[in-house]
Amino acid sequence: MATVRLDQKARALIRAIPDSYHSALAKFFGTGPKDIETARNQHNAYKSALESAGIEVFMLEADHNHPDCLFVEDQAVIIDGHVLLPVPGHPSRVNEQPPIADFLVREMGGAQICRMSGDARMDGGDILRLG
């Protein structure tokens, strides 16, 4: 979600936690997942909180081949109906993007969708939107 108020949001996209979550990249930084069931319970609580706030929540299936797939914010940047699909910073995350891109193409009907190319790499979660 961008840095705007929750009451300005109508829809959210999340992805289920894969069985492989214990191998997520965060574990290499010493802060990785400890308990998948706890993570799933927290994720369900997050989904419920969004729904309680009146947000329509779409949940994509987990991809058990990609432990980081639940971090959907890294796979797209959406501002004012424009979508940027970045090349993820870590090569292991590149194949997480197609289901998210397909969803955005389908759900955002006439949105301008741009894909990064070349050697540039970026995770969408590294973007801070101001104003």
Language-model features, listed with the residues they occupy:
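The feature marks the mature, well-folded catalytic cores of soluble enzymes
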Residues: 1-131
